[in-house]
């Protein structure tokens, strides 16, 4: 498309850097298997009208990474992620004063709360739990929860290793899981 051509030209980058091959699938199961790396999709609950919705289990050389996908409280994730090396989980949150307002509650019904995420982490016991895709809701006079408030809420119910993902953060999965924050540019 023209946008890609312009960006490639402006930045003097080869077009092959943006080539991508997609493969659509309509049911859960193994979606990739090459050289010992397997990716298996599984269905997750993101609400009655948001289907299908997928999570992913990635396995390689005895290591396991699970991505919940954008989901509400779904304990299938906990079972699939049992004793994984790394569990990425989405989250939605609002302060107590506004979480039951109709518009806020409607959005939260499609997401896992911090307390629910803590229960999933406690049950699955990953080497590292990582919060991704945070839907943080607020209203005038009621700002969204801060990342510190999110961490404190989760740590009230879960005492394992935990971090909140940032763009360009890297993870090294081995005997231990190492977090490498994005490089300062």
Per-segment meaning from a language model:
Residues 1-65, 145, 149-178:
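Binuclear metal-dependent hydrolase catalytic cores
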Residues 55, 64, 72-169:
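Cap/insert and terminal regions of metallo-dependent hydrolase folds
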Residues 81, 178-179:
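Generic secondary-structure boundary signal with a strong preference for alpha-helix termini
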Residues 180-185:
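A polyampholytic, Gly/Pro-enriched intrinsically disordered region
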């Amino acid at each position: 498309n023209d946008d890609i051509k312009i960006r490639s030209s402006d930045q003097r980058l080869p077009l092959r850097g943006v080539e991508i091959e997609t493969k659509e699938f309509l049911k859960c199961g193994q979606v990739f298997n090459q050289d010992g790396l397997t990716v298996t999709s599984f269905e997750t609950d993101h609400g009655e009208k948001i289907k299908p919705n997928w999570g992913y289990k990635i396995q390689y050389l005895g290591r396991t990474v699970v991505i919940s996908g954008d989901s509400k409280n779904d304990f299938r994730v906990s079972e699939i992620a049992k004793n994984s090396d790394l569990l990425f989980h989405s989250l939605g949150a609002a302060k107590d004063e506004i979480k039951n307002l109709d518009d806020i509650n409607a959005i939260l019904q499609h997401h896992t709360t911090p307390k629910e995420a803590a229960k999933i982490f406690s049950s699955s016991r990953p080497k590292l739990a990582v919060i991704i895709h945070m839907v943080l809701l607020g209203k005038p006079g009621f700002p969204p929860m801060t990342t510190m408030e999110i961490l404190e809420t989760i740590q009230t119910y879960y005492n394992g290793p935990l971090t909140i993902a940032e763009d360009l953060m890297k993870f090294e999965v081995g005997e231990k899981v190492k977090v490498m924050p994005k490089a300062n540019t």
